Structures are given as structure tokens and as C-alpha cells.
Amino acid sequence: MRRMPRFRGGKVVFLRSVWYTVKLCAYFVRFGVELLVRRPRTRQARAEWLHRFCASALRGFDIVVSIEGEFPQHGALIANHLSYLDIVVFAALHPCVYCAKAEMEHWPVLGWMTTMAGTVYIARGRGGSALKAKSGMQAAVDAGLPVVFFPEGTTSNGDELLPFHSGLLAQALGTGMPVTAAFIQYSFDRKNAGATIVEDVSFWGDMPMLPHIFRFLGLRGIHATVRFAERPIAFVSDAKRRKSAAREAQAAVQELADSDRTVEV
């Protein structure tokens, strides 16, 4: 397993990580109690709960989000994938439903959060997973919620887009829903001694999750930038030509990566 970098920043940064870990636990207690008391049963209610949770967490941890364009109100949203923080950012911007790999269900913290929010988990290679994805997407759209997924299938260090997988994209196209591209990236607005976006914000490879989260919580001035395409992707390929459709989708996200106009929210 790839080792995390030595804890940098000294005692002050370490104590900040401890404090924000306690604060994060308090958020889970607060919103967990709300979940138990209100018992949201519909997809819309659960998505609204996740939206409030994530928006509150970003404010509480002083994470700034800048956007260009608008979150699509319906259909599917696809984006590059850098970190567990991506999930929090997109959910904070708009109520939505995620389609994600089954392993995410067992992630500490985020696994519980996304499960309670009605995430559609997909076990690749298992029989019936494609049908489950398609029916889950359709149910979300029928409830008036956009569906979010990351076609790279895993996180990266952000140097370049990984090849897009075609499975979930084919299921989205098979329902006839529009698919809109987005691009997310991170930067620091304040100095963080020895920290880098690649090692301390992006979560990729075989980095151990809990040590990474602890270090992440000690950072200051994290700034997320999200760009949304102006309109859904005009696919030439259909669900039956899913590999070609995946390349078209990747090109749409890459186009956003190459642009640089943002508005702080």
C-alpha cells in the first residue's frame, strides 16, 4: 500500500486536524439525528437531506466553491473524479442521486452518508448490475432528480483524464435522458506548509483513506472550481455504440478542463 506523506505543518496543523475531526463527527451526529427523527422515505427527501448536510459541511469547513454555468435540473451529470470531496461538492450544489461503485458503500463516513441518501450502487461484473443501474437512474429522473456519476470509474491525481468507462453512460443513454458534462478542480487560497493538491486533496491510487481524511481536515483555504457545460452532450453515438459514446463524453469533459472562467458562490 502506498504510504501517506509524513504529517507536515507541525503541532498547530495537527491540532487543527483533531479539532475538525471532532467537528466532522458533530456534523454526523446532528444530521444523523435529523435522519432518524424525520425518516425521509422518498428519493427527493433523501436527496434534500444530503444536500443540506453537504452544503452545511462546506460552510463549516470554510471550503469555497466557484462555478461556471448551472447544475442541470434533470438527466445525468458526468464529471472527472479527483477525491471523495467531489461527492460533497456536487451534492452541496444541488439535490441529486449518485450512481457509484459498490465499494463506496463501505467507505468510512461517505459510505454511510451516500447510502442514506439513496445512492445506486453498482457491482461491476455481477449479473443484473446493468439493469439495476438503468432502473435506479430512471427512478431518480422520475423523482425529478439529476443523476451524478464519474465515468473514469476511480479517482486520479488530476494530471489527465483517465479513459471513460462506458457502462453507466450506456444505461443513461438507453433511458433517453440528457447527459451534461462538468469538470471539477481544486486549489489553495491560503498557504498550507508542505501540502499539495495532488497529495493532500486528491485521493487516488492506494492511499489509505482515514489518514488522508485526517490530513485533509487540517488544511486551510480549499477552493473547489466546478464548470458545467452550457447544454447536454450532442452524442453522435448511441447506447449500442457505447465505446464511441464514452470517447465523446470524455472529449466534452476535456473541453471544460481547457476553459477557465469561474464565478464564486
Can you say where each PLM-predicted feature lies in the sequence?
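A transmembrane-helix-recognition feature enriched in membrane-embedded lipid enzymes
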Residues: 2-67, 112-117
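Catalytic core of membrane glycerolipid acyltransferases/transacylases, capturing the structured
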Residues: 27-40, 59-60, 73-128
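Residue-level preference for the first positions of well-ordered beta-strands
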Residues: 74-76, 119, 144-150, 178
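Generic beta-sheet signal
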Residues: 101, 122, 150, 182-184
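A cross-family acyltransferase "interaction/gating" segment
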Residues: 110-111, 159-240
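Soluble extracytoplasmic domains of inner/organellar membrane proteins
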Residues: 130, 137-138, 145-147, 151-164, ...
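C-terminal/domain-terminus segments
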Residues: 236-260
